[in-house]
Amino acid sequence: RDPANSLLSLAYTLLAKECESALLVAGLDPYVGYLHEVRYGRPSLALDLMEEFRSVLADSVVLSLLNNRRVTLEDFDDSEGFPRLRKEAWPKFLRAWEERLNERVQHPLLRKRLAYREILLAQARILVKHLLGELPRYEPFAVR
């Protein structure tokens, strides 16, 4: 493993938790998915929802941090055999993560500007409407 993959793993973990929270608020069980295999303790539906946002949230935050050298090799400790973000570097990562989640973009279906965190919840609610038959199909979120 390398530092970039370590950051991606961290970002994916945070994104999965954000998706799980959005699904719970929308009244859905995050453990019953349709793309990811349902397994005990695995939030399959959260992982399903996460797929729409993986590149636009997690990947983009990590690439930005690395490309702009806001996080460097010196920010990692590999004394345990794999690169771990040092305690002092966590605020840089979390600040970038929160900035991205709070960034407002146009939601194509709702036709209004929302923060990405709000879009996660909106997508969960759109999924509810689809499952209840109020929408003929589920439209995944895509940045245009």
Task: Show where each model-derived region lies.
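N-terminal intrinsically disordered, cationic/polar leader segments
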Residues: 1-144
